[in-house]
C-alpha cells in the first residue's frame, strides 16, 4: 500500500509539473521563449518524478512486465532528459546563439539526443502500459504516450505554434494523471 501522504505529494507535484510543461507553451505563443518560461519548463522534470513513481506503484500489480520495463526506461529517461532539458532551458538559453551552436556541434549533441530517445521510448512504453492496465484514466495515458515523446524529440526544433500545442497537450496529460491520483486518496480522519 502506498502511503496517502506520498500519493498526495505525487499528485500536487504532478499538477505543478503539468502546469510547468503546459503554461510556458501557451505563453510562448504570444511572447516567444523568455528566461521565465525557460526556467519554469526547466524545473518540470524534477516535479514529475514523484508522480511517475506513484503512477507505477499504483499499477505495478496489473501492468506486468511492460509496466516494469516502461517505468524503468521512463524514470531513467526522465533523469537523463530532465538534466538535458534543464541545461538547455536554464543554462544554454542565456548564451549567445553561436556559442550554443559550437557547444552542441560535438559530443554533447549526441548525449542530448540519446537522452531524448531514452525518455521518448520509456514514455511510450509506460504510457502504453498505463493504457493497457486500466488503473489510470486512458485518455491522459495515451496523450502521455504520444505528446511527451514528440515534445522530447522536437526539443532541438525552433519554437512554433505546433510545439506550443504539444506543450499544452503534454502538460494537460501530466496534470490530469496527477489529479486522478488525488481523487483516489482517502481522507485521513482525525488527523
Question: Residue ranges of each PLM-predicted region?
Answer:
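Hydrophobic, aromatic-enriched alpha-helical segments typical of multi-pass transmembrane helices
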Residues: 1-191
Amino acid at each position: 500500500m502506498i502511503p496517502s501522504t506520498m500519493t498526495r505529494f505525487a499528485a500536487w507535484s504532478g499538477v505543478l509539473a503539468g502546469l510547468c510543461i503546459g503554461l510556458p507553451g501557451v505563453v510562448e505563443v504570444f511572447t516567444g521563449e523568455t528566461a521565465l518560461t525557460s526556467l519554469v519548463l526547466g524545473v518540470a522534470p524534477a516535479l514529475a518524478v514523484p508522480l511517475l513513481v506513484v503512477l507505477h506503484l499504483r499499477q505495478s500489480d496489473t501492468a506486468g512486465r511492460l509496466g516494469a520495463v516502461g517505468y524503468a526506461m521512463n524514470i531513467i529517461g526522465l533523469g537523463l532528459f530532465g538534466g538535458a532539458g534543464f541545461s538547455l532551458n536554464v543554462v544554454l538559453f542565456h548564451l549567445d546563439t553561436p556559442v550554443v551552436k559550437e557547444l552542441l556541434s560535438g559530443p554533447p549533441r549526441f548525449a542530448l539526443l540519446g537522452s531524448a530517445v531514452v525518455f521518448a521510448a520509456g514514455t511510450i512504453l509506460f504510457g502504453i502500459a498505463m493504457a493497457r492496465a486500466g488503473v489510470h484514466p486512458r485518455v491522459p495515458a495515451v496523450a502521455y504516450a504520444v505528446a511527451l515523446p514528440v515534445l522530447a524529440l522536437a526539443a532541438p526544433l525552433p519554437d512554433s505554434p505546433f510545439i506550443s500545442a504539444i506543450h499544452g497537450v503534454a502538460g494537460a496529460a501530466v496534470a490530469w494523471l496527477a489529479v486522478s491520483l488525488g481523487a483516489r486518496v482517502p481522507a485521513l480522519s482525525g488527523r
